[in-house]
Amino acid sequence: MATIPDWKLQLLARRRQEEASVRGREKAERERLSQMPAWKRGLLERRRAKLGLSPGEPSPVLGTVEAGPPDPDESAVLLEAIGPVHQNRFIRQERQQQQQQQQRSEELLAERKPGPLEARERRPSPGEMRDQSPKGRESREERLSPRETRERRLGIGGAQELSLRPLEARDWRQSPGEVGDRSSRLSEAWKWRLSPGETPERSLRLAESREQSPRRKEVESRLSPGESAYQKLGLTEAHKWRPDSRESQEQSLVQLEATEWRLRSGEERQDYSEECGRKEEWPVPGVAPKETAELSETLTREAQGNSSAGVEAAEQRPVEDGERGMKPTEGWKWTLNSGKAREWTPRDIEAQTQKPEPPESAEKLLESPGVEAGEGEAEKEEAGAQGRPLRALQNCCSVPSPLPPEDAGTGGLRQQEEEAVELQPPPPAPLSPPPPAPTAPQPPGDPLMSRLFYGVKAGPGVGAPRRSGHTFTVNPRRSVPPATPATPTSPATVDAAVPGAGKKRYPTAEEILVLGGYLRLSRSCLAKGSPERHHKQLKISFSETALETTYQYPSESSVLEELGPEPEVPSAPNPPAAQPDDEEDEEELLLLQPELQGGLRTKALIVDESCRR
């Protein structure tokens, strides 16, 4: 057989090397992919599939990649630095596609409805709106940090899950809250009629199209591009300003934004308060009585958008706006944090006249539910509280606040309540109860409390007669152990002793007095629990007879060898001084003696103190 030429051998070797390197690269990529988060892996696989479908097409990151074995440049994709998710091109692209699909489905849904078709014809083409709204929604999603979304959910339940996406708005419109939605749209149409540059025809169009689902799109399409950008900003600001959600977040956000937009363009400030007062008396043409009640509620909510009902935005606007916003609602109705307005019946007024309340305590109680108001507005409220009938403030206090009491700070809440109680002996019952203060134990009628606080000093002549000396835990299943006189301890030890009541308690190294003056270690490896927890010093002392008969101290060499009989070492000649509880110990040891004689004669107990901690 002819020998294989040299060049062929080299070619084969090179091919083998290439195959090995390709295999190694594939293996490395597989490992890297397995360690990657799932979303990133999905992105890369999708991109590779796209590139594989059209091989000649240049990839955005790498050159051309064929569908065959991976190129050496392919690892550049895997090493690509992936920044914040909302800046990722692919995620943006996907989001835009999803939003366009959503919009198409919404438009189809709107076409099926007979009413608002005329309003749809007057709007700009769907293409323009599609360009506008995904950006608006995306920019809002990008601007809302996790903290703000958490704040948004701090409010009362019910509407927590409602976001501004039109799809969810559509679901919400089909739910039983449809009536309130319609009335809020009417009020929105009135608001926009007041805003600068609006014509009656436009507000009429808004009123006609109140059944349309994506309300935000209507608002955006009626603003110039600059204004719509400002409006998006206003939406995110509204998110920051309202940590407590109303019945519908979407409704209140659009309303707050619109009110603020009108207020900022300082032309209409004066007639705003008059309009608010007027709006409340307007009859609504085709709306049921229930709807008018809800409408008036939403109008009050608008009017208070810049008063001190818990909207922090008021702190950023001039104080006079807040004061003016309060005037229309003063004699009418007080809106609470939850957005529910409460009508006053004659019975309520009688109840108020029966128990009048000084305005200072009412003011304090108003602060305690966690209503966050600007300082100027708080002064305004204080001034109004003296002249105004007190039932308005009482109403604010009597409904429990939806904000968690931690907002007010439990200490401050308790202090305010104490002051209020000093001022007014019968405290208002419906106020949310303060967290119970950890005070002295209850009287001995309660068996649980007497067991928990057993031995705590309750003051002269209060409670059951207590034992002198330190406290000990009583386990009800066993007989009560005799109290051993020891160092008196502070009540802090009671708290330490209570949790471990059912467990077996081991003596710590501090509590064992070793005979013969051996080293007392800070912590023995046999000790369970830290010596700081138990302050008792149990001094163990043995009678001489028991020591002579029972205990052997084997020598070191015999222990190491473990061979032959273990030589006895004579016990320490000077046993420790007899202690007051020697007799008890002797009795116990005499009981244990036969057992000890049997067990310890055979093998001495070896305690290795050098074990690992």
UniProtKB/Swiss-Prot annotation:
Residues 424-446, 567-578 have a biased composition (Pro residues). Residues 295-309 have a biased composition (Polar residues). GO terms for cellular component: cytoplasm; cytoskeleton. The modification N6-acetyllysine is found at K457. It comes from Homo sapiens (Human). The modification Phosphoserine is found at S54, S125, S133, S175, S195, S224, S368, S432, S490, S530. Isoform 4 is predominantly expressed in leukocytes and spleen. Residues 580-589 have a biased composition (Acidic residues). Pfam families: Phostensin, Phostensin_N. One of its GO terms (molecular function) is phosphatase binding. Interacts with Protein phosphatase 1 (PP1). It comes from the Eukaryota. InterPro entries: Phostensin/Taperin_N_dom (IPR025903), Phostensin/Taperin_PP1-bd_dom (IPR025907), PPP1R18/Tprn (IPR026671). The modification Phosphothreonine is found at T199. This is Phostensin. Residues 18-231, 266-500, 552-595 are annotated as: Disordered. Coiled coil: none annotated. The keyword Membrane does not apply.
